[in-house]
A protein has these predicted regions:
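Histidine-acidic metal/acid-base catalytic patches
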Residues: 1-109
C-alpha cells in the first residue's frame, strides 16, 4: 500500500483502492504492506503512522474485505516512536486490528 501511495493516483494510474480490487480480481494479491505516507510524489514525502497520512486506511481495509482478501497484512516501515521500535509496532498492529474489526462490523450489519 505504501509504495502505491508514494506514486499516488497520478503516478500509478489508479488509486490504491482500485488497485486492490484489480489485483484481487486476477488472484494476484497475496501480501499487503500496510503503511501510509504524507503525500504522493513528486512532492517531498515522508512515511507516517498509519492514521496520519493522506490515504484513508479504513477505505483500504474495506476494499480488502470486499474482495475477501485472505492473505497476509503486515505493518511496513514503521516510523520511530517514543518508547522504541516495539511501541511503533504495537501501535500499528493495534490500529490495523481496529480497522479489521470496524470493517467486519460494517459487513455484519
Amino acid at each position: 500500500v505504501g509504495c502505491w501511495l508514494e506514486g499516488g493516483e497520478a503516478g500509478m494510474g489508479v488509486g490504491v483502492v482500485e488497485a486492490v480490487k484489480h489485483f484481487a480480481s486476477q488472484n494476484q494479491l497475496f501480501k499487503v504492506h500496510f503503511r501510509n505516507v504524507s503525500n504522493p510524489m513528486p512532492e517531498p514525502w515522508s512515511e507516517t503512522l498509519i492514521d496520519n497520512g493522506y490515504q484513508d486506511m479504513h477505505e483500504v481495509m474495506r476494499a480488502l474485505r470486499e474482495v475477501e482478501f485472505d492473505g497476509c497484512i503486515i505493518p511496513d516501515h514503521i516510523p520511530a516512536m517514543l518508547g522504541g521500535h516495539r511501541a511503533g509496532v504495537a501501535y500499528s498492529i493495534a490500529y490495523m486490528r481496529a480497522l479489521v474489526q470496524a470493517v467486519n462490523n460494517e459487513f455484519s450489519e
